[in-house]
Amino acid sequence: VTPENPEDPFEGYLTEHGYASSTPTTDGQRVYAFFGKDGVHAVDLDGNRLWQTSVGTQSSNRRWGSAASLILHEDLVIVNASEEQRAILALEAETGKVRWRAEGAILELAYGTPLITKDADGQNVLIVIAPGEIWGLNPTNGKLRWYAAHSLTGNVCPSVLVRDQIVFGFGGFRSSGSFAMKLGGRGELGKDAFIWQSRASSYVATPLLHEDHLHWLDDRGIAWCIRASDGKELYRQRVEGLQATGRPVYASPVLAGDHWLVPSRWDGVFALALGSTFQLLAQNRIPDDASDFNSTPAIDRGELLLRSNQTLYCLRSDTKS
């Protein structure tokens, strides 16, 4: 892709993730990719370009670039363009035309990928977390259904998690923390919507929700587990073999059988046991790759897809042919 709009200078945090941090998505007919100020692109399954739509050319006060990934809903491609124009946009999947736009200055520094789930009344709702607020939008037309104030300010990087009509939010800097709140309602939701609030937090990675536990490795090299039902801390443990300085982890954890995996930037992939007790099971490195491993891995049919800044790897158990 040849850039058509000027990007932020390649300096600071941009050198750690670049201009193509978003994960592409597909509906089986087209592949959609987001490249920040160069907009959203659609190609067919043979790689032929179909359309390109600009979503703005602004920069936040941090000038960190974009990170959120695209999501699909019905015939729409939804993009968090908080960096480019302080807005959430829905594009028509076939043409790239803007169907709706939800704007707000508070969206600046909202880096997480939105999520669509069912509200308490059974209606689809698009959940967007921003510094100081969380929104529930109608994904068909972008209209605001509900919103609530929260204590996570500064910048919010992790994406929200949802299960059983409960939304979990993480992030913030310097006022960081986490919360769980009940889905549902209309208009402004009060404090009674929140089930719990905690100072435990993840700065960049989106935690893994498994049964009644939330697991993550933070950007200081500490493994966390808190109880999803009440926010109680179950363990907080520094991980042996993981560098403790320089933000050693950006990737989010993924579930792999009876354990969870998370790549570190420089010290390999760590496997930890699920459950309320800390147990480091393995640390695996790719010794001839000295570049950063910043992205979240994907698992497909027993194979682990792992990307560094220079190489894409497909790994499988040596017991499988």
Predicted features along the sequence, with ranges:
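Noncatalytic, solvent-exposed loop/strand surfaces
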Residues: 1-321
